[in-house]
Amino acid sequence: MTAKILGSLALFMVASVAQAKGLIMTPPVSSFLITQKFVCQASNNHPTKTAQITVQVVDFNGEVIQEKSVDLAPLASTWTTPLDGGVLNPDLPARCIIKSTNVGSKRLAGTAAIWVDFHVQLAVPAVAVPQ
């Protein structure tokens, strides 16, 4: 029983770290917990179709703090937006929600699904150096 619990906990921790690093993609909606400023980058790997992407920063009451939409051009175009999630409240961090309105979650045989890769990178805060 203890081994089963530890195994489940380890799997949860690995999945959480992978999602935080942007390694797990779950279109059409990906959600990342943020506690400081961050940058979001998306790459559209479809050769002819445009991906429609909306990035929102919301608090846990569902209120939208910031929102930006973009049509991401074909052929691995990239888009980076400096959305300022900030630290609204150390005990109540915000959440970044990335929505893609026309992105397929998997490639199907005979279809040309749009595939978008998301990466969320936390900005490193400046550190004051004593004089």
Give residue ranges: language-model regions.
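Bacterial N-terminal signal peptides that target proteins for export
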Residues: 1-7
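Hydrophobic h-region of N-terminal signal peptides that target proteins for export
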Residues: 11-19
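Gly/Pro-rich, tryptophan- and cysteine-flecked surface segments typical
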Residues: 19-131
